[in-house]
């Protein structure tokens, strides 16, 4: 997820103007869960500050610190004294549905949620027989299955015994997959439940798919000021203190945060999320993108299929390409994104000069300056100055 996680934990990356983990919390709450334990480590103060004890969401949140990254099994071991009876464990970087959670909660046995996938890259794949998991393949090429471990589990207290029997892996972690294999071979085994929907957020461009999914159910709302001669088509949500100026043409689903200045005469296209304090100015077009808070895209810019970090400033005439001339899939750092259209991934506090051009799949690190007329492509490291 770098450069987007250089200043924040992955779970706090925004989709539809909420952190990933907030979407997860809301689905779990709607499924009837009211007590949460957040296992935190990197940049934990951001999670604590945002969620506190959970009062805003009508739930109770406790915290467990994993200061050394020793694996998921180690993280679960830490909360052994904080849970009683069966409990749900879910990775903080997935999107799951309330209905699937409710179904999982009716179980009585150790259960792994699984999902059929077309692209197994980077995923743990499982083999299933008779409603149980019989084999696990951790991120292997050409796995003999299309079912992936979805990172959502129902555990009984027996999992803690399995974790105690789990040895440290060659990479120095206590892998939950090894604990799951122990459960497979003992007692009632490891049951499985197939999910109806699921999104895994492994790469920056995965945020765009999740953002589109979350915005699909957006309810129109206007808490700001919309001037005359503004066109709003489809569901558009405008935050408090935001001004949408004359001539703006916005096609939803689009969500605009608080205290933004939008327009005049701009075009915002579907599946766009604009964070708090942003400026989208004259003759600007934004399409299917995530714009994080306090970013300025002020005049004569095109931003499509991109993720733009906090506090960025695009100079006049800066354009981001989002389609290869040969129409092939865009690659980022050699990785096939499986997307024909993908713009750029900009970290926090990136600034560009006038008429800078950013090529498809370009990744720009934090605190980077791209000078006037620069053509940027590939991977640009943080704190770079390119003229």
Task: List the predicted regions and their residue ranges.
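Catalytic-core segments of class I nucleotidyltransferases/pyrophosphorylases
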Residues: 88, 102-105, 132-216
